[in-house]
Each structure stands twice: as C-alpha cells, then as structure tokens.
C-alpha cells in the first residue's frame, strides 16, 4: 500500500506541531551509499527515530534510477563512492526534471570549508558528518523538508 502523500500547499501557515506531524507521517527517504553498514544504520535510525519509509541504493547509478522511480521526499547521498561519486550523482539528480525538486543531503566523513560552499552552490540542502547521531539525522532531514523547530 502506498503511503499517503502530503499536500504541501499552505504548510507554512500551519502550527509547527501540525507541520511536523504531517512530515513524520508521509516521508520516504532514499539513502545512497556504497557502504552496507552505513546504509543499514541510517535506515534503522530513520525508521526508528522518525518512522519514515526508507529506500536503499548502493551506487550513484542505482540511486538515480531509484530516485526517478520511487520519487522520495528527500535523498541522503554519500560523497565518496566508487564509479559515480556523490557530486556527480548530485549533478545528474539536479539535471533530471523528475528528481531536480528533491532535497539532497550529503553524508560524508571528509567535507571541509571550500567543499561545503561548493556543495551548497550545487543545491545541497545540508551536509551531515559520519558518524552521525540518529536524532540529528532526522532533524536535518526534517529541516530540509520544511519543518523548523519552534516555527
């Protein structure tokens, strides 16, 4: 059964608790990472902490295919992957009319200063660092989806 999709029209006029409840109830997150352990930990974190549906991809190519077919609400993308790295995957996602609107959050162990600015210019919603805290991960994705604490 398909999860209910949220009508985002007027979300900014709703009280914060209602926006958050709608976000929690409707989200499907695509995790693109070549490391199985990271995919599994991130998936378990998002399923447990936020109750979100998770779709997994082990490469940039597979991630682009899944993003187009699954239409996730957000994408968590590893920077360092073989064959097609995170930045290349990001550019292809943003160039595709079916996936350009999806917020992308980068997951990395190494991004510093200039790289973070470069990724922001490429349209990244946020950069998260490994190892990550499950609650922080859920909060960052929530923020990328339009929910802000206290607002």
Language-model features and meaning:
Residues 36-55:
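Two-component/phosphorelay signaling modules centered on CheY-like receiver
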Residues 81:
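Receiver (REC) domain active-site loop signature in two-component systems and cognate sites
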Residues 56-74, 91:
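Acidic, metal-coordinating helix/loop segments flanking the phosphotransfer/catalytic sites
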């Amino acid at each position: 059964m398909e999860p209910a999709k949220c009508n985002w029209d007027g979300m900014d006029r709703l009280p914060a608790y209602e926006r958050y409840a709608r976000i929690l109830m409707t989200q499907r997150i695509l995790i693109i990472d070549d490391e199985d352990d990271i995919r599994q930990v991130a998936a378990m974190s998002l399923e447990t902490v936020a109750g979100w549906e998770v779709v997994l991809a082990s490469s940039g190519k597979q991630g682009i295919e899944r993003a187009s077919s699954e239409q996730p609400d957000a994408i968590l993308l590893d920077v360092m992957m073989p064959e097609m790295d995170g930045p290349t995957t990001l550019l292809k996602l943003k160039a595709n009319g079916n996936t350009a609107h999806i917020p992308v959050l980068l997951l990395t162990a190494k991004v510093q200063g200039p790289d973070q600015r470069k990724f922001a210019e490429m349209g990244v919603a946020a950069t998260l660092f490994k190892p990550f805290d499950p609650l922080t991960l859920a909060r960052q994705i929530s923020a990328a989806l339009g929910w802000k604490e206290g607002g």
